Swiss-Prot record:
The lineage of its organism: Bacteria, Pseudomonadati, Pseudomonadota, Gammaproteobacteria, Pseudomonadales. The chain crosses the membrane at residues 1-21. Pfam families: TatA_B_E. It comes from Pseudomonas aeruginosa (strain ATCC 15692 / DSM 22644 / CIP 104116 / JCM 14847 / LMG 12228 / 1C / PRS 101 / PAO1). One of its GO terms (cellular component) is TAT protein transport complex. This is Sec-independent protein translocase protein TatA. The Tat system comprises two distinct complexes: a TatABC complex, containing multiple copies of TatA, TatB and TatC subunits, and a separate TatA complex, containing only TatA subunits. Substrates initially bind to the TatABC complex, which probably triggers association of the separate TatA complex to form the active translocon. Keywords: Cell inner membrane, Cell membrane, Membrane, Protein transport, Translocation, Transmembrane, Transmembrane helix, Transport. GO terms for biological process: protein transport by the Tat complex.
Length: 82
């Protein structure tokens, strides 16, 4: 007996049918179905395009790393005046 019991869903469905009417709900259902079909078709064609393309080679880094040889120097901090 939660807030979304099956009885509540029946009441919500009746209110929606009264507000929108059965004809508008039928058109909405067919539009949603066509949208889902279009989405699936687009996903399937995109996957087919990926299968047709050869695997990409890993890219080379633009700047090759380089090492600088140097000696560390000791830095003395100035005395604090507290």
């Amino acid at each position: 007996m939660g807030i979304f019991d099956w009885k509540h869903w029946i009441v919500i469905l009746i209110v929606v049918v009264l507000v929108f009417g059965t004809k508008r709900l039928k058109n909405l259902g067919s539009d949603v179905g066509e949208a889902i079909k279009g989405f699936r078709k687009a996903v399937n064609t995109e996957e087919d395009d990926k299968k047709d393309q050869p695997a990409a080679q890993p890219a080379q880094p633009l700047n090759q790393p380089h090492t600088i040889d140097a000696q560390a120097q000791k830095v003395e901090e100035p005395a604090r005046k507290d």
